[in-house]
């Protein structure tokens, strides 16, 4: 079997200058083969920039577009192709958008292999360790703060027992942050599990320290990305605060960045995104690294049902895969792109036993939002 094409699909719902905080854009790849098997992958990244990286012409031996690197290759040789893409694009890649694009292709290759062998991806990764995975919901809060009551009330009614919020109006105004936190905690009650995603908005160690102490009475399960992940010393000091769990890692790529982050940040929880960190292949490496270093791994996931399906397959096989993020985005790219999206049911998502990612894309929706 040989790869005949790498098709890049860029989707965007709003106007080109609009924000996509709710997941209103997407980068999808379809890897085509001469045997008719098509693999699907995605990256939660800038779609048009990722497409440019995949389709780039060759400048020299280590400055090559990913499509050129893998055309004509055997898609079942997944690790070989990961290494080949990494090496032959390292002059322009190695981190960031280059690995984001590689992640999408890697997921598509696992989809192909799983379909070819007629077995679920988790079986190719070593076997299924769990039939279902605990899920927490993630939403973007609103302001005025009272508007969050109905949001979280509806999520509790759906069966969520753990929620995370961040983005939107949260992070840039301390008084507003505390007001939003107060309303949400009051609505869910003291025994309900809450996480907060700051997305680096507290900027400095001193400001983050001040805010962490202010939100301590709200009993947060973890504080995610309080500062930029470049500030490893600041992370380490925040992680040393008693009774507070610090998490991060969604913007990091490859085992190399995660090794440094785990070793120097002292973060309690690491959060690689399977569509950014290097795909399923690299996620398995990072997972083993986290286990060796005594870190809890909770994957980041706030994009389409493609990301969700890939993350479920990984967590089904991972030793420590006991928690998954479930987006509450209202974007049609989250709700409708995958026709048979894995559902949330009473606190869990169940692991499908179908070969491949087991998903069906809405091709009419793709054509509607393709750019």
Language-model features: locations:
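Shared catalytic-loop signature of beta/alpha-barrel
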Residues: 213, 219, 230-348
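Glycine-rich, aromatic-flanked loop segments that form ligand/cofactor-binding clefts
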Residues: 97, 106-142
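Metal- or metallocofactor-binding catalytic centers and their adjacent structured scaffolds
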Residues: 32-116
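A cross-domain feature marking catalytic cores of carbohydrate-active enzymes
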Residues: 43, 137-139, 165-167, 196-200, ...
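Conserved, mostly hydrophobic/aromatic
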Residues: 3, 36, 105, 118, ...
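Structured beta-strand/loop patches that form or line metal/cofactor-binding pockets in enzymes
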Residues: 1-40, 44-51, 330-335
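C-terminal extensions of enzymes
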Residues: 335-371
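Metal-dependent enolase-superfamily TIM-barrel catalytic cores that perform enediolate-based chemistry
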Residues: 126, 131-242
């Amino acid at each position: 079997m040989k790869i005949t094409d790498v098709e890049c699909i860029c989707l965007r719902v709003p106007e080109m200058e609009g924000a996509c905080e709710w997941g209103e854009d997407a980068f999808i790849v379809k890897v085509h083969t001469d045997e008719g098997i098509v693999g699907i992958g995605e990256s939660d990244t800038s779609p048009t920039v990722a497409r440019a990286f995949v389709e780039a012409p060759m400048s020299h031996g280590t400055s090559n577009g990913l499509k050129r690197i893998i055309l004509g290759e055997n898609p079942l040789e997944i690790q070989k192709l990961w290494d080949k893409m990494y090496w032959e694009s390292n002059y322009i890649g190695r981190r960031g958008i280059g690995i984001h694009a590689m992640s999408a292709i890697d997921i598509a290759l696992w989809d192909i292999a799983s379909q070819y062998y007629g077995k679920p991806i988790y079986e190719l990764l070593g076997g299924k360790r769990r039939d279902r995975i605990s899920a927490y919901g993630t939403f973007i809060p609103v302001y005025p703060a009272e508007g969050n009551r109905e949001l979280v009330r509806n999520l509790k009614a759906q069966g969520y027992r753990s929620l995370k919020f961040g983005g939107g109006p949260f992070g840039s105004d301390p008084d507003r942050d505390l007001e939003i936190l107060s309303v949400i905690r009051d609505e869910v009650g003291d025994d309900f599990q809450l996480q907060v995603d700051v997305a680096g908005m507290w900027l400095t160690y001193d400001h983050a320290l001040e805010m962490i102490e202010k939100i301590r009475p709200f009993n947060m399960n973890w504080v995610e990305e309080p500062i930029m992940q470049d500030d490893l010393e600041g992370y380490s000091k925040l992680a040393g605060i008693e009774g507070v769990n610090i998490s991060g890692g969604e913007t990091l790529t490859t085992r190399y960045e995660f090794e440094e982050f785990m070793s120097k940040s002292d973060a309690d929880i690491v959060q690689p995104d399977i569509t950014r960190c290097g795909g399923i292949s690299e996620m398995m490496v990072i997972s083993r690294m986290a286990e060796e270093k005594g870190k809890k791994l909770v994957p980041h996931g706030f994009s389409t049902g493609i990301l969700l399906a890939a993350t479920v397959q990984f967590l089904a096989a991972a030793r420590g895969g006991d928690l998954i993020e479930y987006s509450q985005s209202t974007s049609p790219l989250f709700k409708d792109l995958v026709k048979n999206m894995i559902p949330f049911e009473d606190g869990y998502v169940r692991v499908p036993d179908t070969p491949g990612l087991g998903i069906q894309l809405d091709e009419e929706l793709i054509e509607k939002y393709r750019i």
